[in-house]
From Swiss-Prot:
GO terms for biological process: mRNA processing; regulation of gene expression; rRNA processing; tRNA processing. One of its GO terms (cellular component) is cytoplasm. This is Ribonuclease 3. Mg(2+) binds at E40, D113, E116. Belongs to the ribonuclease III family. Its cofactor is Mg(2+). It comes from Variovorax paradoxus (strain S110). It is an enzyme of class 3 (hydrolase). Its EC number is 3.1.26.3. Residues 154-224 form the DRBM domain. The lineage of its organism: Bacteria, Pseudomonadati, Pseudomonadota, Betaproteobacteria, Burkholderiales. The keyword Cytoplasm applies. GO terms for molecular function: double-stranded RNA binding; metal ion binding; ribonuclease III activity; rRNA binding.
Length: 228
């Protein structure tokens, strides 16, 4: 098996009995007619149930409406994108040549969908208990509390507040490249924290979305350094 897939299984703490499921979960529709969208559909349901169970047990005093609000925040694309970055899924995605050239490996929607597909693949490979255990491991790095807003702080705001809290200047964003046809452009944006000598890139369907993706990548970098 490819070394990258072996390392991914170690990060997931799940060894696939059927490695074809793992490969399928990482296959975008631009790569093959046999792609991950059905697994994504399944994984979305498994994720929602696993997160619902997690919240039901952890936030036992919270009423239904508030549980739904917190769950919506935990399963939205921004959260899944950041978890996918932590798992280092980008270089393992199987994308068509055009999608790969236009920034697909770093596109938040593609990464979030692949994460859901992975959860679906674990469910088919080993059942709900294994999939739920994976979800709980993934969310160990996510702060869960009853006051989580329906729309949580976006990555740019979170990064800005962290830098200000550490008496550092605001990050610098610049468009490194504009990719794709004029009617379907994607923006490759660089986020730089000069005082730390750090740069990260992000891809989005607009400049703002690219900045958010780059900020999310920077937060992951800071977390890996033990800073954030």
């Amino acid at each position: 098996m490819d070394g990258g897939l072996t390392a991914l299984q170690e990060r997931l703490k799940h060894s696939f009995s059927d490695t074809r499921l793992l490969q399928l979960a990482l296959t975008h529709r631009s790569f093959s007619a046999d792609h991950n969208e059905r697994l994504e559909f399944l994984g979305d349901s498994v994720l929602n149930l696993a997160v619902s169970h997690l919240l039901y047990t952890r936030l036992s005093a919270l009423p239904e409406g508030d549980l739904s609000r917190v769950r919506a925040n935990l399963v939205k694309q921004d959260t899944l994108h950041r978890l996918a970055l932590e798992l280092q899924l980008s270089p393992l995605l199987r994308l068509g040549e055009g999608e790969a050239r236009s920034g697909g490996p770093n596109r938040p929607s593609i990464l979030a969908d692949a994460l859901e597909a992975l959860i679906g693949a674990v469910y088919l490979d080993a059942g709900f208990s294994a999939a739920e255990a994976l979800v709980r491991r993934l969310y160990e790095s996510v702060e869960i509390n009853p006051r989580m807003d329906a729309v949580a702080k976006d990555p740019k705001t979170e990064l800005q507040e962290w830098l200000q809290g550490h008496k550092m200047k605001l990050p610098v964003y610049r468009v490194a490249a504009t990719l794709g046809a004029a009617h379907k452009q994607t923006f490759d944006v660089e986020c730089e924290v000069p005082e730390l000598g750090l740069r990260e890139r992000g891809i989005g369907g607009s400049r703002r979305a690219g900045e958010q993706a780059a900020a999310a990548a920077m937060l992951i970098r800071l977390k890996a350094r033990g800073a954030a």
